[in-house]
Amino acid sequence: MNMEITNLKSYKELVTLSAEEKTKDLKDYLNDKNRSESLIKKFKNFYMDLSRQRYSEKTLNKLVEYAEEVELKKKVEKTFMGEKVNMTENRSVLHTALRIPIEKINTHKIIIDNKNVLEDVHGVLKKIEKYSDDIRNGVIKTCKNTKFKNVICIGIGGSYLGTEFVYEAMKYYYYNMELNKNEKDQVNNFNNNYDQDNVFNVRFLANVDPNDVNRAIQNLDQYDTLVIIISKTFTTAETMLNARSIKKWLSLKIKDDENLSKHMVAVSTNLKLTDEFGISRDNVFEFWDWVGGRFSVTSSVGILPLSIAFGYKNMRNFLNGCHDMDEHFLHADLKENIPVLLALTSFYNSHFFDYKNVAILPYFQNLLKFSAHIQQLSMESNGKSVDRNNQPIHYNTCQVYFGEPGTNGQHSFYQLIHQGQVIPVELIGFKHSHFPIKFDKEVVSNHDELMTNFFAQADALAIGKTYEQVKEENEKNKMSPELLTHKVFNGNRPSTLLLFDELNFYTCGLLLSLYESRIVAEGFLLNINSFDQWGVELGKVLAKEVRNYFNDTRNQKKSDNTYNFNESTKNFIKLLLVQIKKKKKINTNLK
């Protein structure tokens, strides 16, 4: 379907409707009981509240019409069926297939190259289940015939961000599952004597900066450590340099190649290179070219290390949560479809209000890595400048995503959100804490105190405070009248509230799939390919020339290479190398 989205009938009508919406105040909308109730959407025990967005029911219905006009439903269905919606790389996009339970292997068939891909998916999952159970139960041992205690995951971008988010999100929930076998009250919740046999210390190594290597190995013993190297091609420059560095670290104590291989695992499709690296084929876990890196958490990329950390049964619950939200995304009516409504809301805010940022604000400290994952997931997917018709784009595409857990963010960047540029926010809250504590002399529990801020921030952004209110308050505080404008909050700042019962493995899966699905939907609304990332490539290509130059210069090689750096780059490279030149004579070849 060739289309310029801004020429569509519904888009033009949204231009008119949004102009009307700009004259309205959220304070009035929030007093409309019917509207407020109709904009709370429910799925399972999860709620989404859109009542603080700057649209009426009429405008929201027009947004749904727009989704229908761009044939969103049909495009989502094609994606789930395995059609090659990633047209620039001629690939299917089937991260959703990774979550389909084994009992649906025949009812949810996905045929690619005359084969049901679910058979391969569950073959790998079965291998992960056995391997992770054997690691956890001490059946697979270290070269010292002891149980592994530590895991280092080496990857970059989508090969680690999502997995790290899930690990940090669920780590203390898992620990407390062990503790809660013995009932405790909220006062005595500080007894954290975890069973160390069931706790694996997982670290992530991504940055090629050697400081990240140092951080990853700090206070670890090689004999206790399993290394998982994640690279589909086993050629990713940063990942493989880090892998070689960690292999060298392991070999400082583990001299024998056979013993060394017991401490290394790969998630890759390149068996030739994993063989050459010294990794046993039994320790190589597959994934497929229809799994994009940023959508790979539920492949062996994430499920392998997370199953070692938490047990495969818990990760199956996580996959079930993902699958249930996938099914909701695929089948629910657009007017009740939570990922679609989130996508339409972002599309509306970006295109018709020109809001270019989104703040992700989880009121749950264990989601401290969630915003970083969503930042990559959204901005690498939808940060594009060419549409699906291969034409340059002249409208807003992806917004800039950032965030920090509440209440930390309130003492950081919320000042700008309240009184600077308008930034729509998405607040994520939970009814229950992983670590509930309440003391008799406190008015509320610690978690309730957190959630008071969750609700207060949403209303403060929407309602604000007028000059008249500030003036009335000032009768008591005696602030100089000319300074009162500094305390005015304009309000009318949109927010979305997401509320879950608790963050468990299942709801963590719901949350992940919700955002994955929302970003896929938004890409179709924008008429772009959300599944390639050519913007990553140019820097890699240019880095090769700099790498070759560093190699020639530092090793004082005579080279026939011609380095075509611009003058600015030449000057700064000289500054980098000047200290080395002082120590020994080096020919920089830069004239």
From Swiss-Prot:
Keywords: Cytoplasm, Gluconeogenesis, Glycolysis, Isomerase. CDD domains: SIS_PGI_1 (cd05015), SIS_PGI_2 (cd05016). It is an enzyme of class 5 (isomerase). Pathway: Carbohydrate degradation; glycolysis; D-glyceraldehyde 3-phosphate and glycerone phosphate from D-glucose: step 2/4. Its main location: cytoplasm. It catalyses: alpha-D-glucose 6-phosphate = beta-D-fructose 6-phosphate. GO terms for cellular component: cytosol. Pfam families: PGI. It is found in: Cytoplasm. It comes from the Eukaryota. The keyword Isomerase applies. One of its GO terms (molecular function) is glucose-6-phosphate isomerase activity. SUPFAM superfamilies: SIS domain (SSF53697). InterPro entries: G6P_Isomerase (IPR001672), G6P_Isomerase_C (IPR023096), Phosphoglucose_isomerase_CS (IPR018189), SIS_dom_sf (IPR046348), SIS_PGI_1 (IPR035476), SIS_PGI_2 (IPR035482). Its EC number is 5.3.1.9. Homodimer. NCBIfam families: PRK00179.1 (NF001211). Belongs to the GPI family. This is Glucose-6-phosphate isomerase. The lineage of its organism: Eukaryota, Sar, Alveolata, Apicomplexa, Aconoidasida. The gene is GGI.R1.
